[in-house]
Amino acid sequence: MKIQIKKFKKIDDVTVVLQPLNIFIGANNSGKSSFIQGIQFAISGCQTLKLKGGIWTGKGTKTLSLDSSEYLYTPTSNIEYLYHGKRLIGSRRREDRSWIEFILSDEKTSSLKISRGKNGGFTTSLDGRDLGDELSDIDNPYC
């Protein structure tokens, strides 16, 4: 499994290819815990989209606007403070928004992106239906 995390907490952009056993070593505040929290937050985001009734489009995308309190797991009570180096702020135009992004690949690829929506919620978008369905499965959590 390859995991890429962009703009999450202490992490600007990192890609890690996971092995059966992984050991993270680094100085305090270098992003070790942020990486682990990022994986948990990404899976939680996928599961939340499923629980809240997100529906796959024909293009293989599922998108909902959610409040911080609606996510199954967040490392902090307000998602806007999870953006790398500053608060996550929105924009009326989707192409101008800042995004927290998680890309997971294991023969199939799926990405979860979170931005501040124009109405104050958090636009949560999952691309890649094949792996996305596995990541969203609450009864058999992805491990």
Where are these regions (language model features)?
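P-loop NTPase switch/coupling surface
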Residues: 1-143
